Amino acid sequence: MCIRDRHRFEKKTLFMIGTFLYVITDLIIYYITGYENFWLLAFIATFGFIGFGMAGVMAWSMIADTIEYGEWKSGFRAEGVLNAAHVFVFKLSVGFSAWLAGVILESTDYVANAIDQSPETLNGLFIMGYIFPAVAGTIAIIVTYFNKYDSNFYERIFSELKQRQS
C-alpha cells in the first residue's frame, strides 16, 4: 500500500486549510466583531482555535518529514540536529514576539494594573492579537503553497532511502 492511499488529504493542504480558518476568523473578529461583545468574539474565535490546532498538528508532522528529506539530500540522518534547530527557532520567535509585544504596549501607552486602558492601547492589543497572527498566517500559507513537498515527493524520497539501505 502506498503512502498516498493511507492519507486522504495532503499534510500541506490541511495545514493551509487550518491556517486559512484562523486567518479568516482573526480578520472577522478584528473588522466585524470587535471586543465589546465577548460571547460573539468567543464563539467566532472557537473556529479560529480549531484551525490553529489543525495547523499546529500538521506543522509538527511536516517537521518530522524534514528528517527524511535531510537524509535523502545529505546522506546523514540528523533527527537531533533538526529537532534542536526547530526548538531554537521556536524559542527565538517567542522571544521576538515578547519583544514586539513590549514595543507595542510601550507605543500605545499601556498602563500596567490599570482598570481602564486608553482606546489606543485597546486597539494596539487587538492588532497584536488578531492582525499580526493573520499576517503571519497569510505568509505561512503562501510559503507552504509554493513548497514542492507533498505525498508524491515524500514517497519518492522514502523509496530512494529504502533502496539505499538495502
Task: Give names to the regions the model predicted.
Residues 4-166:
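Membrane-embedded alpha-helical bundles of multi-pass transporters/translocases
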